[in-house]
Amino acid sequence: KKGDRVLIYMPMIPEAVASMLACARLGAIHVVVFGGFAPNELATRINDSKPQIIIAGSCGIEPGKIIEYKPMLDKAIELAKYKVKKCFIFQREICIANLIDGRDFNLQDLIDNSFSVSPVPVKSNDPLYILYTSGTTGDPKGMVRDNGGHAVALKNSMNMVYGLQQGDVFWAASDIGWVVGHSYI
């Protein structure tokens, strides 16, 4: 519901961006965590953001190897003081994760049985998302961006910083767990 936090721990797949957009439509605050983080780093961000739901992928695919996300998520939840009650897992065919009864749900099953909802009205200063700093100089800090400020900053920076005009193509190699990837992908 509006104002709830939803942590997204997924590889760079379309479902990650769709999850961000779904949260925005519902007025929920999405918290994207870089998929390469180990359980202790993820647990730190779970404790701080206190998400009502976690959306995760079963795995990520890197050159020459598969990275299983679900065991890292399970360990992070075990380590975290804040206990998440529901996890929606996007099962990738290359690595089907074991789901924990009562806590974990197959995201595709939920999508298949979903229905359309109207967008929830939000104020320009309502939080849109939280992204965490890397934590290299101390504890990671959750940076809150609001709906209006984020939209205005993106529009302005695309032209003023990158010189882009309508119809131009932009490519960013960053992960959506970092501000460049989150903002420009």
What residue spans do the PLM features occupy?
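Structural core segment of the AMP-binding/adenylate-forming
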Residues: R25-Q108
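Conserved pre-ATP/AMP-binding loop-to-beta segment of ANL
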Residues: C87-F90, I100-Y132, D139, G149, ...
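AMP-binding/adenylate-forming
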Residues: A28-V31, I46-S58, L128-L131, G142-I185
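Short beta-strand segments
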Residues: I8, F88-Q91, D146, A172
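Aromatic/hydrophobic pocket-lining residues that form π-stacking "cages" and hydrophobic walls in ligand
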Residues: S19, L73, Y184-I185
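Flexible loop/turn segments at secondary-structure boundaries
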Residues: P14-V17, C95-A97, T137-P140, V152, ...
